[in-house]
Design a protein with these regions (language model features):
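Blade-level signature of beta-propeller repeat domains, shared across WD40, Kelch, NHL, RCC1
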Residues: 451, 462-485
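Loop/turn segments within WD40 beta-propeller blades
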Residues: 31-37, 74-83, 164, 170-177, ...
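A short helix->beta-strand "capping" segment at the edge of beta-propeller domains
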Residues: 2-26, 55-57, 149-157, 343-349, ...
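WD40/WD-repeat beta-propeller blade N-cap
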Residues: 21-28, 63-70, 113-118, 153, ...
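WD40-repeat beta-propellers
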Residues: 48-52, 95-99, 188-193, 219, ...
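Short loop/turn segments immediately following beta-strands, especially the blade-tip
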Residues: 100-147, 192-200, 252-257, 303-342, ...
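Beta-strand-rich domains and repeat architectures in extracellular enzymes and scaffolds
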Residues: 20-46
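Conserved strand-to-loop turn within each blade of WD40 beta-propeller repeats
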Residues: 43-45, 88-92, 175, 181-185, ...
Length: 485
């Protein structure tokens, strides 16, 4: 394992920073940080409130697009800083596409004259809250504007229809070309952006996946890290879905452009509420791991079992040279008649220490530190740390010392023995420990969601680099927390 993983846990404390303002005064479902900007989108009631991570206060609101509660929101990645795109998923069985053009910094002459040390990005976010003069649509009359509601900087541009019941979750692929939505109707839909330009907003359904046997609670795309391209018989995009049927499914697009289920992850004894991919690239080139949390009170870590022999065999098939390459398929280079089975083996390599005594609703994996956070129905926040297994580390060190005096023919045997010693919970010779926990994070209320995000507030030592936790609860309050170690 990389040296970044410490040999043992250290003490830590979860300390409140302050709640985002204003309070939402009704159940809030989830808060999603923008991938690059200091913005946080919180789904609640029939709207989405966008908070500034700089001021920890409201930046703008998206209202009028849905007839029932908004359950989820996702930012589209890859856009310039002055343009925003967000998808909201609602209990009204639709997903809505919203756009915001933030060229308002130029429209606010005061923004350029402020004596302030904020970055241009910070000035732009601040200025955008002042300049609310742009109409949502130049062709709308006053009645249409009042019906749309919310801040006039946001334009509700498209409704995605097709689900038969509540949309539980939505997520963009890392490229932004695909959008996944899931629903109480037991299906996962994949939509593709087919517009000629970003402003076209033309999306078509490319897959409807119906293999789950219960409500689909969550979808998550594998992050864009080098290791995700290792499986050459598929495209680079990998989607995971979690369900009321107690399973997680892994989906990939095959060489014929069909989305197929390549693995079913079984082990939970209750609804799988949430999933999240490992965010940090693994130094050893390992495929990203996956976290899942469940109504059974557990958090599990899943890992793809790499088949190196199979990968090497694939590389050797399909002919050599330009003629051979031309005759191969674009994905993997294996003719249909020679392709291996579209299946992957995933194993549960860890069940994190039991702390929660009720449903675990949400988990989050820090990209910066590798810490895992969880929360749920019991109102607790729990932090976990992955550590080198002490017995494995000791044996490896002992073997290294012994091997210095052994003949070369015996060194490989000794090394093989050392690397095969792993903890019961992990194939990587690591264990998971509870770093700290906090009870009653939102008082007597359930906590529905937790996420890591970067800090931009004035109290941060390194704005844009430091991390904090954000929790969202039934009390309608979005809270920020610092992890002190």
């Amino acid at each position: 394992m990389p040296s970044a993983i410490p040999p043992s846990a250290t003490t830590a404390a979860i300390v409140p920073i302050r709640a985002f303002q204003p309070d939402l005064h009704e159940r809030a479902w989830a808060s999603t940080p923008h991938p690059t900007l200091p913005l946080l989108a919180t789904a609640h009631a029939k709207s989405v409130t966008v908070f500034s991570l700089s001021s920890l206060s409201s930046h703008s609101s998206l209202t009028g697009g849905h007839t029932r509660s908004v359950r989820t929101a996702a930012w589209k990645p890859g856009l310039p800083p002055h343009k925003l795109c967000l998808v909201s998923g609602s209990f009204d069985a639709t997903a809505g596409l919203w756009r915001w053009d933030g060229d308002s910094a130029a429209a606010d002459p005061d923004a350029a004259n402020h004596e302030n040390t904020d970055s241009p990005l910070e000035i732009e976010i601040t200025a955008s809250t002042r300049a609310k003069s742009r109409r949502i649509n130049d062709d709308d009359d006053d009645s249409d504007a009042s019906q749309t509601g919310g801040d006039q900087d946001w334009e509700f541009t498209l409704v995605l229809e097709g689900h038969d019941s509540e949309v539980k979750c939505c997520a963009f692929a890392p490229s932004g070309a695909y959008l996944a939505t899931c629903s109480r109707d037991k299906s996962v839909w994949i939509w593709e952006d087919i517009g000629a330009s970003e402003a076209d907003d033309e999306w078509e359904t490319v897959a409807v996946l119906n293999e789950h046997e219960g409500d689909v609670k969550a979808v998550a795309w594998c992050p864009d890290v080098p290791a995700r391209n290792a499986r050459r018989q598929y495209s680079a995009d990998v989607l995971a879905s979690a369900s009321y049927d107690n399973t997680v499914r892994i989906w990939r697009e095959d060489s014929d452009g069909e989305w197929v289920c390549v693995a079913v992850l079984e082990g939970h004894e209750g609804t799988v509420w949430s999933i999240e991919w490992e965010q940090r690239p693994a130094p050893d080139g390992r495929f990203p791991r996956l976290l899942s949390c469940s109504a059974d009170g557990t958090v599990r870590v899943w890992e793809l079992q790499q088949d190196e022999g199979g990968e090497e065999a694939e590389e050797g098939q399909g002919g050599n040279g330009a003629d051979g390459a031309a005759g191969r398929l674009a994905l993997g280079g294996i003719p249909n008649t020679m392709r291996t089975s579209l299946r992957e083996e995933w194993r549960c390599t860890a069940v994190l220490p039991a702390v929660h005594d009720r449903d675990v609703y949400s988990v989050s994996w820090s990209q910066k530190t590798g810490l895992v956070s969880s929360t749920g129905r019991d109102g607790k926040i729990v932090l976990y740390q992955e550590c080198r297994d002490r017995s494995s580390a000791a044996r490896a060190a002992s073997t290294e010392v012994r091997s210095q005096n052994q003949p070369e023919s015996n060194i490989s045997d000794a090394s093989q023995t050392a690397t095969s010693v792993t903890s019961p919970s992990s194939s990587q010779g690591t264990t998971w420990e509870v770093l700290t926990s906090l009870v009653n994070a939102h008082g007597p209320f359930e906590v529905n969601h937790i996420t890591w995000c970067r800090r931009y507030d004035v109290a941060a030592e390194k704005r844009g680099e430091d991390e904090m936790l954000v929790t969202t609860g039934d009390d309608g309050i979005v809270r920020s927390w610092e992890v002190k170690r």
